[in-house]
Structures are given as C-alpha cells and as structure tokens.
Amino acid sequence: PTLDEALPVVEQLDVVRRMLFCGADAKHLEGATRIRKALSVERAPPRGAVIELGVLPRLVELSSDPSSPELQFEAMWALTNVASGTTEDTAAVVAANAVPVMVSMLSAGVTDVVEQAVWALGNISGDSTPFRDLVLEAGALHAMCRLVTV
C-alpha cells in the first residue's frame, strides 16, 4: 500500500492500516510512523478514528518486536498518544492488552522505547484509579524502580 502525499494522513487511515498488516517490515514502520505523526498534532488528534480502525492490538504487537527498536518506538509512541486522550481512548489501549507489553518494555534496554513505555504507563495510570491499580498490579512500579537504581 502507498499513500497519496497530497492528502492528509487522516484521510488515508485505511491505507495506513493495511501497511501495519502487510508482510513488509518497512511498511510496518511507515504505517506506525504515519499513525504516530497523525496522533501528535496539537489540535484534535484523530484518536477515535485510529481506535475505530482496529489497529491498537497490532500496534501493541509491533511494539513488542525486538527485531526493530525503531518500529517498537513508533508503535509505542502511537499508543502513548492514544492513551493521553479521554478515558474511553485510554480504555481502548488497555483493552488491547497494552499494559503487560508496556511493563515488559521497561526492561527493553533501548532508551527511547523505555521512555515511551514510561510515558504510556503514566498516561494510563493517571487516567483513573482502576487503571492506576491495573498498572501497579502489572508490576510497573517495581520495573520503574529498577530503572532508577541501575
């Protein structure tokens, strides 16, 4: 799949979704990067549209692939941006089973990936008491303490 550079990414999210699911690793990275950039805009990031695409579980999967730290970083950053939205947005990230992956990324050893995992877990735990408890139960506090004692 290829994008029409003349159109905004938000108008081409279906093409971006296909990039994430195709067999080409380079397309996975391009798709994750495009979603992350679309979600990084200050005014009205398209969180709902990205959630409706059904790509959050795929972003979780890609963020746990140690063969490409750059892809891990982009996918985790996209998840971080979704989790920074409304409670419903954050719940979608949680429902995609992202929390255990994010906690495991705290020991990834790649600074950028670790930093994004910390941000994402902070966004999730800061949303509500139940989400905070979920993050704590997943072992995030112990993993983060290891980061500062290393």
Model-predicted segments: where are they?
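Short inter-helical turns and helix N-cap capping residues of alpha-solenoid HEAT/ARM repeat scaffolds
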Residues: G23-D25, S67-S68, G109-V110
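Elongated alpha-helical scaffolds that mediate protein-protein interactions in large eukaryotic proteins
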Residues: T2-V9, M19-C22, A26-E30, A38-G54, ...
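Buried hydrophobic core positions in alpha-solenoid tandem helical repeats
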Residues: V15-R18, L56-E61, V101-V103, L121, ...
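Structural signature of alpha-helical solenoid repeat scaffolds
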Residues: I35-K37, T80-N81, G122-N123, C145, ...
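Alpha-helical scaffolds that organize eukaryotic protein assemblies
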Residues: D112-E115, A120-L134, A140-H142
